[in-house]
């Protein structure tokens, strides 16, 4: 079982997104955060289960999609490092992940 580690920027982005959603619908924001954490925790057992981001076909990064979020991570059998969270409709910039 891999250890799931959230980076500070990933947590900040998720928090900012949840705060924005909560302005109109606090219950939806809470539900989204819970869904994201549930989906990411599954990576502890299956670290390679996320898809390879279409924008980064030859990279070590993977992503999990929990609408409206894309959650980017790197992982192996020992550790899953959650790196970045963004809204699905935003364009991914490679520098957001620290380069490839």
What are the roles of these predicted feature ranges?
Residues 2-60, 97:
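Basic, Lys/Arg-enriched alpha-helical interface segments
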Residues 66-70, 74-100:
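Enriched for short, Lys/Arg-rich terminal
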């Amino acid at each position: 079982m891999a250890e799931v580690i959230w980076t500070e920027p990933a947590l900040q982005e998720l928090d900012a997104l949840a705060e924005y959603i909560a302005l109109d619908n606090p219950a939806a924001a809470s539900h989204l955060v819970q869904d994201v954490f549930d989906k990411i925790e599954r990576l502890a057992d299956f670290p390679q289960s996320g898809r390879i981001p279409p924008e980064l076909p030859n990279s070590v990064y993977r992503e999990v999609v929990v609408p409206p979020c894309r959650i980017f991570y790197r992982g192996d059998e020992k550790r899953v490092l959650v790196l970045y969270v963004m809204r699905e409709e935003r364009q991914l910039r490679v520098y957001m992940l620290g380069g490839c």
